């Protein structure tokens, strides 16, 4: 999942510049992910949105443990609006097929 998130982040950052945030659906949440050297500035984003920054645990000791934050999908409009007001381009990646073989795709891109 992290690799797919970073692929979307890199693709849209190349297209639109550094002020891109990918909101990636995982169940009933939109997540934002990053590692120490890839992805958005999580401290800046979580501060702006007033949401908690955490890490996703892994049973694999060699795995990348990404920084993550999330917002409930049903309450995401105000977060999207706040990002847009602060000159971010917001890329929405939603689940388009159900579990267990979930596939995701970009469904919207929002900007000023």
Task: Describe the predicted segments one by one.
Residues 1-112:
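Basic, polar low-complexity surface loops/patches
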């Amino acid at each position: 999942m992290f690799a797919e998130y970073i692929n979307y982040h890199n693709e849209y950052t190349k297209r639109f510049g550094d002020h891109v945030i990918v909101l990636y659906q995982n169940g009933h949440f939109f997540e934002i992910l990053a590692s120490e050297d890839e992805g958005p500035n999580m401290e800046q984003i979580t501060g702006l949105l007033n949401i908690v920054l955490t890490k996703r645990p892994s049973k694999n000791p060699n795995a990348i443990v990404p920084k993550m934050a999330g917002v409930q999908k049903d309450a995401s409009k105000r977060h999207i609006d706040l990002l847009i007001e602060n000159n971010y381009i917001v890329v929405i990646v939603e689940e388009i097929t159900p579990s267990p073989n979930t596939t995701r795709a970009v469904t919207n891109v929002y900007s000023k």
